[in-house]
């Protein structure tokens, strides 16, 4: 699988991933002498950065972090490459000084520690040779402040019994918006829908598959849903109630994305 990225510091590197779900500061977050992770929020306390592709949402902390990262790289204890959702100036400066390849605009929520990765900042790509990517759409339907969720039937191929929004696979070079509208009509019978927003793709992980989820927000004037065979139950809920349900991977993040679209 290949993910598009934005190159920040030129270079190419390969290795196994070390993934943190939390923003990271090299000041206090890593041992400057050994490159061992100290920050428990990363989920990787004790892991060493050397030779790893370090993926985390963004950097934080003081400008001293640039020099900590530079020192790690100079002593051979720094990461082989850095992958971010959003590049932070402190990390970017440190990576530049240390000559560590760096990219951003990658949703690190779909990556896992020990994934085999190849980062090419010159081309703006991140490759995961052992992972299969599948492009899908997810349509969030909204009516009077509530959103529609559906429970998947036992007849579908994946995530049987889990709660989801309206979703479907993108075929070939099909336009994602067109596919989203088709799925809404087929799965709910609703036709008078109005597109209100989109967001950057969310990477939802299921073992060795990453679903590249293209999110859409539609308003609908009514709640008269007619389910097809793919789903067996539906509810209209407030977005903040979603965490009460057993959902498909990262549905909460997809909903958050369409209500707060990226710039």
Question: Which positions does each model-derived feature cover?
Answer:
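Feature captures the catalytic cores and cofactor-binding loops of soluble hydro-lyases/lyases
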Residues: 2-11, 17-127
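Helix N-cap/coil-helix junction residues
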Residues: 77, 189-190, 247
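Conserved N-terminal beta-strand and adjoining loop/helix that marks the start
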Residues: 131-148
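Active-site-adjacent beta-strand/loop module that shapes the phosphate/pyrophosphate-binding cleft
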Residues: 143-145, 201-225, 235, 239-240, ...
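Conserved Nudix-box catalytic region and its N-terminal flanking loop in Nudix hydrolases
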Residues: 146-186, 190
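A short coil-to-beta-strand element that immediately follows conserved catalytic motifs
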Residues: 190-200
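Charged phosphate-binding loop/patch that engages nucleotide di/tri-phosphates or the phosphate backbone
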Residues: 252-263
């Amino acid at each position: 699988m290949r993910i598009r990225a934005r190159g920040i510091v030129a270079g190419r590197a390969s290795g196994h991933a070390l993934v943190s779900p939390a923003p990271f500061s090299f000041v206090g977050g890593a041992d400057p002498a050994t490159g061992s992770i100290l920050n428990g929020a990363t989920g990787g306390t004790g892991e060493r950065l050397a030779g790893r592709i370090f993926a985390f949402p963004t950097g934080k902390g003081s400008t001293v972090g640039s020099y900590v990262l530079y020192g790690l790289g100079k002593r051979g204890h720094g990461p082989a490459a850095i992958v971010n959702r959003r590049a932070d100036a402190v990390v970017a400066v440190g990576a530049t000084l240390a000559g560590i390849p760096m990219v951003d605009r990658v949703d690190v929520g779909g990556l896992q520690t020990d994934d085999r990765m190849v980062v090419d900042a010159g081309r703006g790509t991140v490759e995961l040779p052992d992972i299969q990517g599948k492009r899908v759409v997810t349509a969030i339907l909204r009516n009077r402040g509530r959103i529609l969720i559906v429970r998947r039937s036992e007849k579908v191929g994946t995530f049987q019994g889990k709660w989801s929004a309206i979703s479907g696979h993108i075929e070939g070079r099909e336009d994602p918006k067109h596919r989203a509208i088709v799925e809404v009509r087929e799965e709910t019978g609703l036709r008078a829908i109005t597109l209100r927003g989109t967001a950057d793709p969310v990477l939802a992980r299921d073992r060795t598959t990453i679903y590249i989820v293209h999110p859409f927000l539609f308003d609908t004037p009514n709640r008269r849903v007619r389910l097809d065979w793919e789903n067996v139950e539906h509810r209209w809920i407030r977005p903040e109630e979603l965490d009460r349900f057993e959902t498909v991977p990262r549905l909460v993040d997809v909903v958050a994305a369409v209500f707060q679209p990226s710039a």
